[in-house]
Amino acid sequence: MRHSRFFFFLISLVTSSLLSTTFSQTLLSDSVPDYQNLNVQKLESSIRFELSQMNFNPDLKSIYIKNWYGSHNFQPVWIQIPINTFKIDTLLNFISHIGVHGLKPDQLNFNIITKLLNDLKNEMLTYSQLAVLDTKVSAIYIQYCAGLKYGFINPGIFEAYHKSVQQVDSVFIITCFKAQKTHLLNYLSRIQPRTKAYLSLQAEKDNYINFVDSVFTPIPVLANNQTIKLGTSHPSIPLIARRLMISGELPYDPMYLSSYLTFNYKLLKALNIFRNKTGLLIDEEIGNNTINALNLTFAEYINKIDVNLERLRWVPLTSLGKKYIRVNVADMTLNAFKNDTVALSMKVCVGRQKNSTPLLQSKIFELVINPTWTVPNSIIINEIAKIAMKDHSYFERNHIRVYLQGEEIDPSTIDWTKITINHQPYKLVQDSGSANSLGRIKFNFKNPFSVYLHDTNAKGALKRHDRAISHGCVRVEKPLELVNFCFPDLKPVYVTQNQKNDLLKDKIRHSIDLKVISKAGKEALKSNPKSMKIDRLRLNPFIPIIMDYKTCFINPKGKIQFRNDIYSLDSLLNIQLLAIHQH
């Protein structure tokens, strides 16, 4: 790869020199050539001129393309002598089906290229137009291949996204052009995304396309946040039934206007299938959240699928390996994987919109048992200082100590009204124990945002439907099960190491006031109780973790799921996807 990049660097210097020369010869007598006897030198000169007019893109694809042409004496890539359009036709055929990936063909100049191609077939193009065709086809070819392999949008442009992903480089460009020369059809077929998650979403998109032309009457929003109770009548019930019949949750009934006047159990069952699919609260009432989800057009659901197809095209720079943890912030869940199979699943609490959980990739390297909590400055300034103005007992009740320059001080001696963003000299530390906000276990991983996974002393928060309530860290529902997942998976024959791991697990259990369960743990507790206390455990190996954001995905049961765009990231990505256009 280093040699390829150095080669491209040298070529770019030569190409720049060539492109800076005058092109008066190209501009003279630019007429329709004799297609049986094309002047190769004139065509190459026209291509050189056309490349000099090409705009540089921030992602460097343009300069890579220029360098490829320059390193091959500006020979045409797609215009074959004698004229043969098979390769361009092949590429256009793939681009005509780009809708399965969430884009429109003309975003890649499909109509412009098609017109130029037809003129080529009719031998109507001048040398300069032949050059335009050749370079434009190269540009859309690279954009198409790069988009499918790495994504059409670089996620790094989004403030919330902090994961490193693979990017186009000179090696990829060389691979594309070499494939174009020898096995284009095979290469275009192989570069299509083939993961199970991607193909499953594409299949579901096909299903939703079947619903696009279906007409249903929008359901009126309920006034004053009222709800429709099970067993009651309401004018919207037939409309709700009709909408569920279209998408298949409720069997079709041509007499629905008279069959569904009351919110009955049959409708409830269908409605809860829909609510499960869209991440809504499952209950025996119909509220405005459900009505709003029912009122979304099928085109809007398709758009959500398209946005998440793009997310699936983003390939992490570092492989997650066979054992890893994935937090889907939008779904507010954590799944732990072994060999791409979910081994452990749980609810989590994530950051509210103004304190969003950062999307990143890292590795859990350490477990902290009975952690203390150093309160972030933002919480001191925006929350605790305001409470402390009125309630000095807050600190004692919540086991929080206050320090100034390393010395513990009495919080009642502080004038909390003077705490501002420019004046906050105090360090607040909450004692470890069952009352600690981090609970009994913390999972540390490197990141610049000081976020981590942790247990919680407020278990009720994990029973909420909307769990986007934290200051950015992730509260986990099953901390002890997650601890067990973090231990190495060893075969039973490794008796000694398994016994050591069982003992370590029991030390953690004992340290958080749970009973030990292994034979080794019971013996150690009896012979040396002090040895059973542990406050930190460094993991070996580290466990990869990815904080992700998927608002549409296929669950382990193979069912499509939609989730609220809690951080408004779908809309930002959709704007970028709609703006794609190859000039």
Give the ranges of each region predicted by the language model.
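Cationic-aromatic interfacial patches
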Residues: 26-169
